[in-house]
A protein has these predicted regions:
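Intrinsically disordered, low-complexity segments enriched in polar/charged small residues
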Residues: 9-10, 200
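Bacterial N-terminal signal peptides that target proteins for export
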Residues: 1-8
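An exposed, glycine/acidic-rich loop-and-rim segment of catalytic or binding clefts
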Residues: 21-368
Length: 368
């Protein structure tokens, strides 16, 4: 009987070892100022993810369709030069210090006003013109994945405090886990997210208008003409923003709705009912052509659904594909835009002695 137990235990350990994702690293060229860039490949039976130290970004995710054929389901470029030249899409990157927008690039902490350089319609977007997406991070292999680390000095893009950030990408079965942590030497504001553009048809084919989206949120945060929240939390009931039932993205995207006109499509924040209460469902996506599905869970209080409205056919990505309007969609799990200037929104203040923690999981599957 003891021998049987030993065999069972050995089998369990062997299966566990076999299930572990493989991780490899290689050089991926240099930036224009000569900084070496690396790329990591994390592979499991169902998922292969490539992540580069330039912007701590996801370069590719290979996932199977309903026939078992794998294809790349995120937009991006074949090399560092492509990402470095493109300063507007943020393909696959970690954006920060403050993902999304800060009105007029200005906020105050304890009576001191701080200014972030403006880079989007008179506002600061994704941490300013030299945010985290433009930095070369330090990468290291960890169990089932890679950890990206960055030290942002006091005053970087106008933000106070030296901020130390760690982002862990791990692959477990069909899921890509992203775990964020950060500490600061001075009170500061922080909002980290990943800016991957998903196209579940694979290899950048077609648009996402036929994709069926579900967001289990009763409310969203409307924006003004420069895409800054008005401060209101509005009901989705009776609007094109009601995705509580699975709905094709293209079904209402051209409706005569003032909010849709502002961003020429969807580019708003949805309010999650489970924010701050552990992992909760943020969204699901289904591509009827490939059968691929994407399920997003997060600990964050919001998710920005962006339908790729500003892709305009001027960028050629992987596989020689020209990225036209609606070529990909983003589901950016986050705190709300302009939270530092909206006391009613969940706080993004981080103080010395505190550690920011958040997690988002992207799980891929198929529907036959």
């Amino acid at each position: 009987m003891k021998f049987k137990h030993v065999l069972v235990g050995t089998a369990i350990l062997l299966m566990s070892a076999l299930a572990q994702a493989s991780v490899s690293k290689t050089s991926w060229g240099k930036t224009t100022d000569g900084k070496p860039v690396e790329i990591f490949t994390v592979s499991d039976a169902d998922l292969t993810v490539r992540i580069t130290t330039f912007g701590a970004r996801v370069v590719s995710i290979e996932a199977p369709d309903k026939s078992g054929k794998k294809a790349d389901v995120v937009l991006g470029y074949d090399n560092v030069a492509g990402y470095e030249k493109d300063t507007s899409t943020y393909f696959g990157s970690i954006v920060g210090r403050y993902g999304n927008r800060i009105a007029n690039g200005t906020f105050s902490i304890d009576g001191t006003t701080y200014h972030v350089p403006l880079n989007n319609n008179g506002n600061a977007l994704h941490g300013g013109p030299a945010g985290f997406s433009t930095k070369v991070w330090t990468g290291k292999e960890i169990h089932d994945g890679v950890e990206m680390s960055l030290v942002s000095p006091d005053g970087d893009m106008g933000f106070p405090g030296t901020l130390t950030v760690h982002v862990r990408y791990t692959v477990e079965g069909k899921s890509l886990h992203i775990n964020y942590s950060a500490t600061t030497t001075k009170p500061t504001v922080i909002n980290l997210t990943n800016h991957s553009y998903f196209n579940l048809a694979g290899d950048g084919k077609g648009t996402i208008l036929q994709d069926v989206l579900m967001i289990p949120a009763d409310r969203y945060t409307p924006v003004n003409p420069t895409q800054i929240p008005t401060g209101e939390s509005a009901t989705v009931e009776g609007t094109p923003f009601d995705f509580r039932k699975p709905t094709a993205i293209g079904a209402r995207i051209h409706d005569r709705n003032e909010q849709l006109k502002i961003g020429d499509g969807y580019d708003q924040n949805w309010v999650m009912s489970g924010g701050g209460k552990g992992l909760h469902l943020a969204a699901t996506v289904y591509d009827p052509t490939s059968g691929r599905t994407l399920t997003v869970t997060t600990t964050q209080p919001g998710v920005q659904f962006y339908s790729g409205n500003f892709l305009d056919g001027t960028k050629t990505g992987k596989f020689g594909i020209v990225y036209a309007k609606y070529a990909g969609l983003c589901l950016e799990t986050q705190h709300f835009p302009d939270s530092p200037n909206e006391p009613k929104f969940p706080s993004t203040l981080l103080k010395p002695g505190q550690t920011l923690h958040s997690e988002t999981v992207f799980t891929f599957g198929v529907k036959r």
